[in-house]
Amino acid sequence: MRYFFWSLLAIAAVLPISIAQAGSVRIEQAPNLQMSGMSGGGRASDCGYIGNRPSEQVTISPQYVEQSGYLRISVTAAGNPTLLIEGPSGRFCSVGQGGRNPQHVGVWPAGVYNIYVGDRQGQSHPYQLNLSGR
């Protein structure tokens, strides 16, 4: 019974961390949002080192697509941040100009987008992810 208690305690301590690793946002009108977290991760990819799970998850509603569908996602972070976006319209990687502040801009179809904020050098830095409409 004693080991069972410690096992439950260990699971309870880890659970909030794994849930908090990725934020989730649904966009139904022109956004002006900021999210934050830590860039990088242990998984090497063609878009730098990323986490095993998305940094953030964004759902674009059909209502927003009817309004305009325009969205700008940008990242501000130290190091060499990357922005990997996987969604209904494909997979996009941005490394930014001069290795700083990658962004992806355009008219997006409705659906769920997994966003990874990575780092080309495999380091981890605090990031700010900005989502804005027109």
Curated annotation (Swiss-Prot):
The highest taxon in the source lineage is Bacteria
What is this protein identified as? Uncharacterized protein Synpcc7942_2126
Q: Which organism is it from?
A: Synechococcus elongatus (strain ATCC 33912 / PCC 7942 / FACHB-805) (Anacystis nidulans R2)
